[in-house]
């Protein structure tokens, strides 16, 4: 079912009692069996990881336990421009992110939603990376597609912005954070995709999530 809208705005705070889980779908990472969850704090959400886990462990041997992802439950069909933003922070070095996924697969073992091809816009202490994750012969693969070198501090709130624009050459991504911007094309993205957030490689805190779509864009059920 396609619901065409004149314009679309979605905005939620992740403060306690201010958001609905029904607006989102939890998504499993394709590299691990772990299917994570969020821990609700007063003004944000953070991955639900073992309380005694060190930050270094969450970045290395406990990487899978730190991975928690969810997407806005409705798929965007873009006409011109879509803007997605989230206010986030990290406790140690990395790596809260915005995710763009053309489609969602299903885990063969459990049937829960699982990422296939997707793009990650990742904030960390040395800058921002854009990673392109693919699904080849039933296995995940990934490559760094673009990046910005910049210093970002732990325990500091940043608003990460992703602007996706439809152009004659395909979908163009412009990333902005704390006054810095960079951009790249996303070949093969297409005009339909899910938008969401992922916490990984350390404790990541998310304070809000917003999507704004231009006139003529649509939502798919």
Model regions and ranges:
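Short, aromatic/His-centered strand-loop micro-motif at the edge of beta-sheets
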Residues: 135-159
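Extracellular beta-strand elements of beta-rich domains used
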Residues: 14, 209-214
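Short tryptophan-centered beta-strand motifs in secreted/extracellular beta-sheet-rich domains
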Residues: 14, 84-86, 155-167, 171-175
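Extracellular glycan-recognition surfaces and repeat-rich motifs
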Residues: 18-57
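Secretory/extracellular carbohydrate-interaction modules
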Residues: 49-135
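Flexible glycan-contacting loops in extracellular carbohydrate-active proteins
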Residues: 183-211
